[in-house]
Amino acid sequence: MFKGSIVALITPMDEKGQICRISLEKLINYHIASKTEAIVSIGTTGESATLSQEEHINIVMLTLELADGRIPVIAGTGANATTEAISLTKRFEKSGVAGCLSVTPYYNRPTQEGLYQHFKAISENTELPQILYNVPSRTGCDLLPETVAKLSHFNNIIGIKEATGDLSRIHKIKELVKTNFLLISGDDATALDFMQLGGQGVISVTANIAAKEMMEICSYALKGDFINARSINKRLMLLHEALFIEPNPIPVKWLAKKIGLIKSDTLRLPMTPVLDSTRFQLEKAIQYANLKIS
């Protein structure tokens, strides 16, 4: 469940900014039909930063309800404060989630020792499998391979979503961690290269609107068939890039609406609607990818 194509699911909202159950159910069914391996609920792409903790919990629980055991659900549980991350993680322990994705604290920029103590405390006070999440471009701090290696010795810290886009990282981490520690890409544009170097999958933004294609890329890659994997990935390269012309999830929500997966591409401030110039690039990318637009 923690290998292959895992979608970093968008959070569909109605025009008033409230959660749209109908669109969420449609998205979940789309991923089940496309054989996506698992769903990450309320990560960066799910707009965790603009949701209250009550909304955060309710959306994860609704996702579990709608998934109904048909696809594993991973809950985003990262927080700036260690006590809050522990509390949120414990909230999901009896919920049925398959595991948690825990981003490094952001804005307060802890040292490597601070990061180690943060994740150590979460591990020692909770039971769910934990996937570390390193995305320095957003958080302002970088979880270095040596710190990852120390954390890999905790039994419930099972892997890392590495979203630096730096492919040299995978070699450094692989040399230092135990052999069963999962290495998952968090960067669609370099995910295939990441897997060729020994990674086990990707937590993907692109999968929101190209679920079948991302599943096929990962499936081929994990079998060692990089010829077929690259053939599909080549069609998606413009899309991988276009989805980050503006901050995620602005572009991907607009495209999800464009192809009929959600009713509205509503975002909460300070996120604002996609620019006309970006729409042009997204339409070009979706045409090149040969994905159907409704």
Swiss-Prot record:
<feature type="binding site">
    <location>
        <position position="203"/>
    </location>
    <ligand>
        <name>pyruvate</name>
    </ligand>
</feature>
<dbReference type="InterPro" id="IPR005263">
    <property type="entry name" value="DapA"/>
</dbReference>
<comment type="function">
    <text>Catalyzes the condensation of (S)-aspartate-beta-semialdehyde [(S)-ASA] and pyruvate to 4-hydroxy-tetrahydrodipicolinate (HTPA).</text>
</comment>
<dbReference type="GO" id="GO:0009089">
    <property type="term" value="P:lysine biosynthetic process via diaminopimelate"/>
</dbReference>
<dbReference type="InterPro" id="IPR020624">
    <property type="entry name" value="Schiff_base-form_aldolases_CS"/>
</dbReference>
<keyword id="KW-0963">Cytoplasm</keyword>
<feature type="site" description="Part of a proton relay during catalysis">
    <location>
        <position position="44"/>
    </location>
</feature>
<keyword id="KW-0456">Lyase</keyword>
<dbReference type="GO" id="GO:0005829">
    <property type="term" value="C:cytosol"/>
</dbReference>
<dbReference type="GO" id="GO:0008840">
    <property type="term" value="F:4-hydroxy-tetrahydrodipicolinate synthase activity"/>
</dbReference>
<keyword id="KW-0457">Lysine biosynthesis</keyword>
<protein>
    <recommendedName>
        <fullName>4-hydroxy-tetrahydrodipicolinate synthase</fullName>
        <ecNumber>4.3.3.7</ecNumber>
    </recommendedName>
</protein>
<keyword id="KW-0704">Schiff base</keyword>
<dbReference type="InterPro" id="IPR013785">
    <property type="entry name" value="Aldolase_TIM"/>
</dbReference>
<dbReference type="InterPro" id="IPR020625">
    <property type="entry name" value="Schiff_base-form_aldolases_AS"/>
</dbReference>
<keyword id="KW-0220">Diaminopimelate biosynthesis</keyword>
<keyword id="KW-0028">Amino-acid biosynthesis</keyword>
<comment type="subunit">
    <text>Homotetramer; dimer of dimers.</text>
</comment>
<dbReference type="Pfam" id="PF00701">
    <property type="entry name" value="DHDPS"/>
</dbReference>
<feature type="active site" description="Proton donor/acceptor">
    <location>
        <position position="133"/>
    </location>
</feature>
<comment type="pathway">
    <text>Amino-acid biosynthesis; L-lysine biosynthesis via DAP pathway; (S)-tetrahydrodipicolinate from L-aspartate: step 3/4.</text>
</comment>
<feature type="active site" description="Schiff-base intermediate with substrate">
    <location>
        <position position="161"/>
    </location>
</feature>
<dbReference type="GO" id="GO:0019877">
    <property type="term" value="P:diaminopimelate biosynthetic process"/>
</dbReference>
<feature type="binding site">
    <location>
        <position position="45"/>
    </location>
    <ligand>
        <name>pyruvate</name>
    </ligand>
</feature>
<comment type="similarity">
    <text>Belongs to the DapA family.</text>
</comment>
<dbReference type="InterPro" id="IPR002220">
    <property type="entry name" value="DapA-like"/>
</dbReference>
<feature type="site" description="Part of a proton relay during catalysis">
    <location>
        <position position="107"/>
    </location>
</feature>
